[in-house]
């Protein structure tokens, strides 16, 4: 009966001491995993931020460009007076101060580039 008690006590002491070591080891493993998890989260966060910035840039670019399907706004033809500050000359024309023949009008006109 004594040997059974001693054996049981010995097994109990070994189990407790090894279990304690496993507990410390598990704690260290968990700490390492949480640190790795944080680095993965930071990486994923940065990746998501980059994707969002790319999408935002594309959306802003699309807003600034005119659609190919949209009609051109009404424009001023060649030789027609235009406003220097708000030129509405048709494409291929530029709002310029007249040379020679239109000097006395003191106005700007649409001319070919």
Curated annotation (Swiss-Prot):
GO terms for molecular function: sodium channel inhibitor activity; toxin activity. It is found in: Secreted. Residues 61-83 are annotated as: Disordered. Keywords: Disulfide bond, Ion channel impairing toxin, Knottin, Secreted, Signal, Toxin. It holds the Pfam family Toxin_22. The keyword Nucleotide-binding does not apply. GO terms for cellular component: extracellular region. Residues 1-21 form the signal peptide. Expressed by the venom gland. Disulfide bonds join 75-90, 82-95, 89-110. Residues 22-74 form a propeptide. The presence of a 'disulfide through disulfide knot' structurally defines this protein as a knottin. Belongs to the neurotoxin 14 (magi-1) family. 01 (HNTX-16) subfamily. Probable ion channel inhibitor. This is U11-theraphotoxin-Hhn1a. It comes from Cyriopagopus hainanus. The lineage of its organism: Eukaryota, Metazoa, Ecdysozoa, Arthropoda, Chelicerata.
